[in-house]
């Protein structure tokens, strides 16, 4: 790991600082016999986008620990451009929740349709490959504060489902 001071590593960051949109054109190898893109392809794109966002925020490697609330709203068709938009919604001590929104764009018309939404949770790893603290979020807007509060509620729900307390 490069030499970055602990103060710099743990300095608060805004959700916008790590937000990302990834795109990928859907080819025949991504689809099933009906011409719909396999759900696993969409999940992989979401995980890649979310992992990059979490690592950007933590300035550390981050690994997936939970895939939460994946919604398949509409099929993604072969030949569409998939856009995966992600941003951090909540952070804990070493955990980072990323909110993901997937759209499919028809290249000839420019029409975009939301196809998926999901929350993925990552844990930042230190040099010893163990969970390590992450920077807090700078919550500058009412929207940031709302997302954080909703993320905190999802975190508590995940802990309750696992039989643990916050």
Which stretches of residues belong to each language-model region?
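Terminal targeting signals and extreme-terminal segments of soluble enzymes
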Residues: 1-166
């Amino acid at each position: 790991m490069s030499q970055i001071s602990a103060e710099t590593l743990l300095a608060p960051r805004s959700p916008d600082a790590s937000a990302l949109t990834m795109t990928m054109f859907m080819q025949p190898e991504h689809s099933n016999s009906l011409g719909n893109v396999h759900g696993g392809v969409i999940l992989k794109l979401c995980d890649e986008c979310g992992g990059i966002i979490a690592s950007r925020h933590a300035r550390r490697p981050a690994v997936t620990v939970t895939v939460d609330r994946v919604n398949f709203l509409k099929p993604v068709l072969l030949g569409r451009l998939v856009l995966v938009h992600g941003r951090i919604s909540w952070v804990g001590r070493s955990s980072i929740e990323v909110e993901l929104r997937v759209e499919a764009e028809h290249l000839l018309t420019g029409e975009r349709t939301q196809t998926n939404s999901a929350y993925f949770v990552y844990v930042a790893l230190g040099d010893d490959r163990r969970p390590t603290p992450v920077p807090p979020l700078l919550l500058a807007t009412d929207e940031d504060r709302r997302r954080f509060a909703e993320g905190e509620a999802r975190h508590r729900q995940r802990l309750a489902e696992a039989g643990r307390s916050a």
